[in-house]
Amino acid sequence: CVVGIGAGMWDRLFDVPRPEYLHDFEALQGGKHSAPSTPGDLFFHLRASTLDMCFELARQIMRRLGPAVSTYDEVHAFRYLDNRDPLGFVDGTESPRGQAAVAAALINEGAWAGGSYIIEQKYVHNLTAWDSLSVEEQERVIGRTKLDDTQLPDDEQPTNSHVTMNTIEDADGNELQIVRDNLAFGEASGEQGTFFMSYAADPRVTELMLRRMFLGEPEGNYDRILDFSTPLTGCLFFAPPAAFLDDADQYARPSARPEAGPQDPTQPATELSAAKDLGFNASSEAPRDQTPDDHSN
């Protein structure tokens, strides 16, 4: 289980400054597509090999939190086939593994060493429109082949493919990485989509990828996948290292400590509530090979 804390919640709960890059998710408005900002207070990412284990842990968490929180979105997700998304393509192929994943996902020094920034977006797919494309057209949207998951050659890679928009480099030509832990979700008779989650030592990497996708690179040349996938949520959380959570009481504001007693019922929210769209998220799936063993999920 990973626990993420939103910017507003951090300010209300803790008497220490926010981690450097913790802020509300910034909405993006492109010429054709937009990414909404739906700030939340708490985010729980639960993983297990079976759904019942996730359900039981989620139930215990909610019992402990009680009336202090309101649940605004709970997504039960799953591993789909050989790590494919509902569009039929393998997801997370370029996500780093092993120590490279640790370096990309976890802050490696300073007061927040071992922590990570989480950005989540819940995408719903228009599968009717997607399935109307030929396989070759779909491959040009994604930038990879559908059957064997091979990246298209550079001279065939569209400038607006999903691969192109998510490939960014620093000034020295080194590719900047994040750890993706996307989940498929949906009902056969209803809504189907992908729950995007990125873990990063520096969320500005993910934010740059999203700006390229929605605003375009150059401007107007947006990620073609957005013609078929629409984000419903957008949140940024910070997952503190376990040691901080173990000693959270010593960092809490006086009003947030248990001995402070109940909050004034006339106030709009308790210290643990007021999440607008994603107060609690129970995501379940089988473990994936690309997730490093020492990166708790």
What are these regions (language model features)?
Residues L65, H295-N297:
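Short, intrinsically disordered, low-complexity terminal/loop segments
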Residues S255, S273, S283-S284, S296:
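Serine residues within intrinsically disordered or low-complexity segments
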Residues L51, Q267-P268:
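Generic alpha-helix initiation/capping and coil-helix boundary signal
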Residues C1-E259:
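Long, histidine/aromatic-enriched segments associated with O2/redox biology
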